[in-house]
A protein has these predicted regions:
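Glycine-rich anion-binding loops of enzyme active sites
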Residues: 1-53, 203, 214-215
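Glycine-/charge-enriched secondary-structure boundary and capping motifs
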Residues: 5-10, 80-223
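Phosphate-handling active-site elements
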Residues: 24-27, 62-65, 140-141
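Ubiquitous "structural anchor" signal
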Residues: 26, 31, 57, 132-133, ...
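Acidic, glycine-rich loop-and-beta core segments that form the ion-binding/anion-interacting portion
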Residues: 33-90
Length: 223
């Protein structure tokens, strides 16, 4: 783990393993131009980029107990106290775990698992994680999920360039699934029933190993 400012002597970590039948691995090897990208919304920062968050909060001379100077969607943040939402509650909102819907999609979803060509966790590295899934194909995000309010606040308060935001944070999209175009609508309907707010966000391209975005400033060709 890379946790500057927090871990000085002890780093305690854990590992979880999953398995598939031999030959049914989803590695990205079956990706092809035109595959549809389905984005699953995040619940917040997902425990990534917190060093930058702390830096911005300190720079603003704010406190984690301060009432958030922005509003968030009702019910998105898990509450542990009464009253108005604080910055601490928002930035420590538990990470959404996609294990159950993803495993169910593979095992009993609306299409054969062979149509699921890649799955990407948008974690540290942001959208550049997509580059890890194929050596030559690219990814174009032309309909990004809505940016969560806390990310907009961090960008404004920290005067952070949009590309750096998408490299550091998930920006509201915690996972991407790449599926065959012919099953994309049925998969989207199925996934949306389990992770509300999911949407088609783009396609796999054949314009080189690069991630491009609706905002031309957001572009990655290295991880």
């Amino acid at each position: 783990a890379s946790l500057p400012g927090i871990v000085n002597e002890l780093d305690l970590s854990g590992t979880a393993l999953g398995w598939l039948d031999r030959g049914s691995e989803i590695t990205g090897a079956n990706l092809q131009e035109g595959d549809v990208l389905i984005g699953l919304p995040s619940s917040g920062v997902h425990s990534n980029g917190l060093s930058l968050v702390r830096s911005v909060v300190d720079h603003c001379d704010a406190s984690w107990d301060d009432i958030a100077p922005f509003s968030v969607e009702d019910g998105r943040v898990e509450r542990f106290r009464q009253g108005e939402l604080t910055l601490g509650e928002i930035f420590l909102n538990p990470t959404r775990i996609y294990c159950d819907p993803i495993v169910d999609l593979i095992q009993k979803g609306p299409c054969d698992a062979s149509h699921i060509h890649a799955i990407c966790h948008v974690t540290g590295g942001g959208l550049s994680n997509l580059l890890r899934l194929h050596d030559s194909l690219g990814w174009h995000i032309d309909s990004p999920l809505p940016v969560l309010e806390e990310f907009s606040w961090i960008q404004e308060m920290g005067s952070i360039e949009i590309r750096e935001m998408y490299r550091t944070f998930n920006m509201g999209m915690g996972m991407v699934i790449a599926v065959s175009e012919e099953v994309s609508e049925s998969v989207l309907e199925w996934v949306s029933g389990r992770v509300p707010g999911s949407a088609i966000v783009g396609k796999v391209t054949d314009n080189g190993r690069v991630v491009t975005h609706l905002d031309p400033a957001v572009r990655f060709d290295t991880y």
